[in-house]
A protein has these predicted regions:
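Mature, Sec-exported extracytoplasmic domains of Gram-positive
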Residues: 2, 41-45, 54, 78, ...
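Conserved SGNH/GDSL esterase-like catalytic core that processes O-acyl groups on lipids
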Residues: 4-6, 12-89
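Alpha-helical cap/lid subdomain in secreted, periplasmic
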Residues: 60-179, 191
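Conserved catalytic region of serine esterases and O-acyltransferases that act on ester linkages
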Residues: 169, 176, 186-246
Length: 246
């Protein structure tokens, strides 16, 4: 059976062609997949949910004219961590309704906190840990409300940033993923939608077997291990909205 996958997001989705790495991992593991995407740098899910927006119209067109099995949703990387959770929640609600009408399964692509030294952390009075926790909390809250799957990429990034910083999961901008980080992203997406451990996948992205092994173990832990969300960051999305009732 062939699986049709659509990615909706921004540069965190298309950086280093991580969607293509995902496809190659799937194919190497005997999973037949078609991969499609609607992405634009810096975009929010609010824009992707707006049919009057250029890319929002593309999302609507894709969902109208194609049949998908899985659709990944990736929010602008700061929005859920800087007090704009309601806009994030509303967009996920709207897109989830459209995706389910297509017959597909929505999956949230949980992103990560900026690397230490990022100007954005200073600007918003965040740390790598606090930004990570806020993102995990927001993605988890709307996932619980709408009964969604979450691809816990941010969880794995935090794990490796703390425990294996020498492997450099970040690009030089302290925001986007390095090539190693993009491989990690792809592994987690694969494990999430197929409910299969990524340890020992056939596709060899790195000639460095040690780095590949670390990525596979971190991906497995993020998908199948316990949540790292701390109690003080736990939240609910119920009733949190920017939508004005008539």
């Amino acid at each position: 059976m062939r699986i049709n996958v659509l990615f909706i997001g921004n540069s965190y989705t298309f950086y280093n062609n991580s969607w293509d790495i995902f496809k190659k991992i799937c194919l190497a593991e005997g999973k037949k997949v078609n991969v499609d995407q609607v992405t634009c740098g810096g975009y929010t899910l609010e824009q992707m949910n707006d049919p009057l927006n250029e890319y929002g119209a593309k999302v609507a067109e894709k969902l109208k004219n194609n049949k998908y099995d899985v659709v990944f949703l990736q929010e602008q990387s700061l929005r859920p961590a800087i007090g704009d959770e309601a806009l994030f929640y509303d967009a996920v609600r709207g897109l989830t309704q459209k995706i389910r009408a297509n017959g597909a399964i929505p999956v949230l692509y949980e992103t990560w906190g900026r690397k230490e030294g990022s100007a954005d952390l200073t600007k918003y009075n965040l740390t790598n840990e606090s930004m990570t926790q806020k993102l995990i909390a927001a993605y988890g809250a709307i996932a619980e409300e709408l009964d969604l799957f979450v691809s816990h990429v941010g969880t794995a990034f935090y794990d490796l940033n703390v425990n294996n910083p020498e492997l450099e999961i970040y690009d030089l901008d302290a925001s986007h993923p390095s090539s190693f980080g993009s491989y990690l992203v792809a592994l987690i997406h694969y494990a999430t939608i197929f409910d299969k451990s990524p340890i020992g996948v056939e596709h060899t992205y790195f000639t460095d077997i040690y780095k590949q092994s670390i990525a596979e173990k971190a991906a497995h832990k993020a998908v199948f291990g316990d949540s790292i969300l701390k109690d003080e960051y736990k939240t609910s999305s119920e009733g949190v909205t920017k939508t004005v009732s008539n």
